[in-house]
């Protein structure tokens, strides 16, 4: 399936009731619309050469007529207001509603404040809206339910996490939309989601040709990059958009298009890798896939009922984190630019998602990252990107002409008490109040606040703006954000069609066609790094089944109460899927070859409270190897630092601060991977197998130092968030591998320390026993090193 696919469904119902008694009623023969009651209790309004409408009889909204056409009286005033007229363009409608809201005084400003909120994470476990509290993501909940946020705080943007099923999600959406349709202005909810299409590693979840599933299963973002196929990535975007719409989701909090120039960063797996040319093309392709609707002939219609808003992240790239530490915590707040490479870091945005090939032209929303882009603001202001006038107003909006929604990353306006506690991320403005931070964001060009559920601090920020800038400025600034926020709701047609046909949703999400496309993409994403003596070759159905030994991991736990010890043994790759191709044994002596599944070395976040308590600065290395690593060649002095250093008072045990400049260096400190046992099991497997082949399946989330692993393996495949089923099909030779590395694999940790966080593809790469270099765009097929058009296009471009 691609852009020329047939339209699979018409997701959105539309409905209407009888015409408003305050509006002149046309004779039946003059009407250009027809009203039909649906089985779900809504009214469908179909029109001659006009928009299809829906609304609920329970919302209080009725129909207005003009020139024989029907319109929803969303504010229930009996007048066809400009924003209710679907014949007008989005800009006109959004501007008219924004002006109306401002004209309504403080009540209208409160509604605008509600639009500026983006809810905390919300699980949809039932079709009712009033249930579970919104998750504050800080270990506690603030008591706010979805209903509270909608009714009291006028919130219209809900971040949906887990959903019980497509049926439950569709019913929940309809109930939610019915509630807000009856409220002031009748503004629909624009629901969103973080990525939810990564393949399940649960061996019980398998692809079966011709069968449907919960949702289509694709490789992770780094796996999509490994295909080096923009057309496939655009197809992925198309399918995600259709499935999201069927779940009531109209904004994707994705794609994550940061340039993965720092190999230790924990979020590398969510990126398109570190090849600049490739990431530009894939960023453009996926956003085109999200935002454009196509007709049966493959023509790009622009915004339509198969479109979702893309919120690209994270401006101006979260990739160059110093030492690989992530900015969700204060110890990772700084992005650094030792290679003076800021301009290349933003190319994915400026030449990619902000410069689309499709009819929507530009991404509809941008999320700045938590990081302080250290010393990049000419004014010398070092604050988080969401607070930075330079990053948003001067660069994004003025220089690169982006006039869409800018939404902060989650919880940047909340308080933070320590670098090591998961709380707010108010980096650089810790001394301000929550309201002052919101004001700072608004003045910097932000429109919306991720993870904020209540309007009170936004209204306080409005009052601050009135006091400091004047009433006219404050009203104009709030109206400006309102137009942007409403534009994204109008563009996807929610004012006319916010409801779902539940049966259509169930039939659409995870349908057989989408499942097949996702599974094929998984297969295309697998990278074969090593294949000595053609251990992996084409599958021969007529040959006698080989016998495989599957390495296992053993875990022993002791119950703290009963002191009972339990030992659990888990196969490193699903025995169920491997048994489709091989006889499986637990005895290495009986096996023809062995398989071991491994995961990237996991060495933590780069910060240790134990080190802090022991008198250190808390900073430790992030390693890409399993065995102990000592950072002898790390920087003696960190590039970025806080004006005050944090330490533990030995008398009180409390965190205190000094006035001396902080040094975040971890030089000479050591760290060992928490999953070092995987290397132990590989060594044991190698010894047990003797000269018989050992195949390593690496589930990679970021780069690996292969010197510990490669010499012990006869063949290596790498998967990026794929199913064991897809990995097994490649190993068995049912499908020939075609993936290419999207990130470099370092020769050692010394080259990792020497590389610049902001410069992609600047490491010495690992060379294996067969003489192959594990660089970007390297991969093997059955014939050897892949050298095709993809390699010619992207192989040498950093």
Residue ranges and their predicted role:
Residues 1-11:
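Bacterial N-terminal signal peptides that target proteins for export
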Residues 27-798:
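Glycoside hydrolase catalytic-domain context in secreted enzymes
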Residues 11-13, 319:
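A periodicity- and composition-biased signal for non-globular, repetitive helical segments
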Residues 13-21, 534:
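Hydrophobic core
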Residues 19-29:
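Intrinsically disordered, low-complexity Ser/Thr/Pro-rich tracts
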